[in-house]
Amino acid sequence: MQSQREDGFFGPAKDYPGEPGLQRDNSHDWWPRMVMLKILQQYYSATNDERIITFMTKYFRYQLNTLPQKPLGHWSFWAEFRACDNLQAVYWLYNLTGEAFLLELGHLLHQQSYSFVDMVNRGDLRRICTIHCVNLAQGIKEPIIYYQQDTNPKYIDAVKRGFQDIRQFHGQPQGMYGGDEALHGNNPTPVSYTHLRAHETRHDL
């Protein structure tokens, strides 16, 4: 929290030369900050520390001002696939403060994120190796989260059909879907990111 600048940005701001096995550049990447937003929400839920509300409000104003020039995919593709984590935090804060600019930001995040509605409609979830399995876990919820702002039934339908396809084409006996890095069908022998996908799939739902 002490790293937050006057414009609302927070976290590391300096890039370093490359080093094998480490990501030392892209310090302004949107995605790592989405992880921190979830932590801040949980901290507020435990403490009611009002500094969290001020902190997140400033950061979301920074996002609204900066995303038009440096969209979610500017530094890496992770933020496009995992924007749901950002979106749910925006709506969480909106439900506490009622600040109208948060809905504007929510719409912008949705526009810049990977379209899971299109993914489902293309039938991508009926094939193998079409998406990174953790991106799927974090992103499949985005349409139903955005439905809180735009009640077009296509968002509900896409999530329902998406989970149906996942169960039919990738479902496994333990209740999760087959995927180590990419979706790999319902063969139970390859390893799966079970713990991570279970956590991320549940989080925003």
Per-region residue spans from a language model:
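Long, well-ordered core segments of solenoidal/helical folds
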Residues: M1-F9, T54-P71, E104-R122, A158-G175
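Active-site-adjacent substrate/metal-binding segments within catalytic domains
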Residues: Q2-S45
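Short, solvent-exposed turn/loop segments enriched in Gly/Ser/Thr/Pro and often Arg
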Residues: G8-G18, F55, W75-N86, Q174-H184
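Aromatic- and acidic-residue-enriched carbohydrate-binding clefts of CAZyme catalytic domains
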Residues: G11-H28, S115-C129, Y177-V191
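A conserved hydrophobic secondary-structure block that centers on an alpha-helix together
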Residues: S27-W92
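Structural helix-adjacent loops and short alpha-helical linkers that scaffold large soluble proteins
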Residues: Y43-T57, Y94-H107, Y147-K160
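Active-site region of glycoside hydrolase catalytic domains
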Residues: R82-S115
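Conserved small/polar residues in nucleotide/adenosyl-binding loops
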Residues: T194-T201
